[in-house]
C-alpha cells in the first residue's frame, strides 16, 4: 500500500521531471554503446520531444518499458520527480498511469474480441476525463470511423495502430511514450498520427518520447534524436 505522501504526490497537478542516470538494462550490458542513452544522464521535462531511432534489438522498447514501469531489470537510477522509480508500489504506478503517463506499446495491447469503439469506451470509462465523443472525434480524424463497430482483431495492423494512438490520447498526461507507433502506416497516415499526437501533447504541455526504425515519418524539428 502506498504511503499517504505518494497518494498526495500523484494526485496533485504538477510538472515533474524524469531522470535516467546511467541506466543499463541487464540484457544489453554487453552491447550498449558508450555514447548511448544507456551510458549517460538524460533528463526529460514536460514539453520536451525525444526520438529514439535505431535498428531492431537496440533496446528501444526496453527504454519505453523502463520509463513506463514495466521493466525493472536494469542498473543505474531512474527517478521521477526526485523519487526512485524502484521504490514505487504497483498502486503508485497505477496512479501515475492514470494522470501522468500515457503509452502506445509496440504490441498495442488492444482487446481483439471487443469492437474498436468498445476499446475506446473502456479507456474513457476508467476514470478518464475524456468523453467517448472526444475519442471518436480523434478516431475519425485518423480515418477510423468506418471501422469503429468492427472487432478490433479484424482490423489491419495499421488500423489497430491508429486505434491504439487514439486510446493513449484519451487521458490527461505529462509524458507520452510511443513505441514504433507508425511502423505499419503509409506516409499519409503516419503524418496524420504525428499531427494528432503533437496537437494533443501541446494542449497538455506534455513531453513526447517516440521510437522508430527510421526517420521516414518526418518528425517535427523540435525532436531531439537519441541513440540506443
Language model regions located:
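Helix-to-loop junction immediately C-terminal to a conserved catalytic motif
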Residues: 68
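Q-loop/switch helix immediately C-terminal to the Walker
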Residues: 107, 113-126
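Conserved ABC ATPase signature
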Residues: 151-159
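Hydrophobic anchor residue at the start of the ABC signature
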Residues: 165
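Catalytic Walker B motif of ABC-type/P-loop ATPase nucleotide-binding domains
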Residues: 176-180
